[in-house]
Amino acid sequence: MIFLRDNVLLESELQLDHVKPRLLGHWGTCPGIILVWSHLNLLIRNHDLDMIYVIGPGHGAPAALAALWLEGSLGKFYPGEYDRDATGLRNLITRFSVPGGFPSHINAETPGSIHEGGELGYALAVSFGAVMDKPDLVVTCIVGDGEAETGPTATAWHAIKYLDPKESGAVIPILHVNGFKISERTIFGCMDDKELVCLFSGYGYQLCIVDDLDNINDELYTAMEWALAEVKKIQKAARSGNPIVKPRWPMIVLRTPKGWGGPKEVDGKIIEGSFHSHQVPLSKANNDETQLQALNDWLSSYKIDELLPEGKLADAIINTLPKKDEKKLGQLKDTYDPYIALKTVKWEDFAVEKNTDQSCMKITGAYLSKVFGENPTTIRLFSPDELESNKLDAILDHTQRNFQWDEYSRANGGRVIETLSEHECQGFMQGYTLTGRTAIFPSYESFLGIVHTMMVQYSKFVKIANEVKWRGDLASINYIETSTWARQEHNGFSHQNPSFIGAVLNIKAEAARVRHHPYATLV
């Protein structure tokens, strides 16, 4: 996909004019992504699961697109363009990373995606938000070991502590350790198994490490079956009235070489198992005969003629795919048409009488309390420990906080999650919204800037989603910004920063709105 503009089925020896004039894309992470995808197909097939695959290293789009073509999802959503035949395959490969084709990163045009694949660090929090209030949903989230160094990912490992297995689904995190970022070793790639077990046991997980390259399929199959069995055990206990206190959720550590299966060495540089495989391992294949031959040998090693005779799938591939189209990773309805509208509440019941003094936030809290009461499973509030300081505590009249590791707020159906990480709140909100529900994120003006770029990335996803014909409606993501520059009260200069509002205003009006309310009734 990165390389070819012709002869995509290798029906003859590659020539220089078969290779694209400009080579764009990322190869290094793709082997791990496609390995996990193939095993998830088998897991879904064997257990009839509702599953979403959230891919943290979204620059590995070639892996996702290849899998989506193989399972027929591209053909479903782009009929006549990317059908599961030789023409559809040629279109997919030759148009990749060029105008009019798929971009090099996963985005809203990618079936099955609920996460913009550019900025790293947010996949895990999005995954946990997606499974809240969806008891039958399992999200497998692959986190690259480079992405795992980010602050948002570091705090998102704690998200299991906010997941009630009685009412919600489950996330199976897979830490993909291939050892390298763009040009440097990763922290996790330099940790041994004991160090990884100690770290993630401290977070509250139990680990299965998959690293035997000679038996990788057997090991990964066993690991996934184990992880699913552990999930079901935790959920069964909670749903039968005997929840496990501080359950240790499963996660998998997958160790494979970066760029596994690609060229081992080019021009004296180690490629497979090094950072040199991160992007384009044969960057001169369009003008160098030696690299062209290396490309020919590499692509021929996959025996395309056996796997895709005349561009059609061999039975060996078909027999690993989910039997039902609606269960395929690219076709689960939760990822593209999930919207559940809220039951509305009459705002007039909360109107403030003329010439009276009222706190606009207290009135808002009372209104939201009623909304939460009318919508017990389709709305949540994610707050960075600011519910009461923002005078929204009336919400607690109809619901409670949800913190599963606290004996006083576990297993009570609480709709309010308070975690002192704006990144985690934003990630939860995105995942919850993109799977059809509605969420609210209240915070002080100066601190919403922490999620400025997350918000912008999300707006890109929504912009493209609105342009894609096969995606349905979604709720908005909703911020309540308080303690603004116009009304500081006791906080002062330290809490003045209108840049978040400015960032929202920079987004086109069809995608974003800012409302300034002069008095309580208008809130």
Task: Give short role names for the model-derived ranges.
Residues 57-61, 143-150, 175-181, 213-214, ...:
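Acidic, glycine-rich active-site loops and adjacent beta-strand->loop/helix elements
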Residues 69-74, 155-161, 186-197, 223-227, ...:
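Short secondary-structure boundary/capping segments
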Residues 112-241, 246-250, 479, 484-502, ...:
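Thiamine diphosphate
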Residues 63-65, 76-78, 150-152, 182-184, ...:
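Short helix/loop capping segments that flank catalytic or ligand/cofactor-binding pockets
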Residues 76-94, 161-177, 202-204, 405, ...:
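A glycine-rich helix N-cap at a beta->alpha junction
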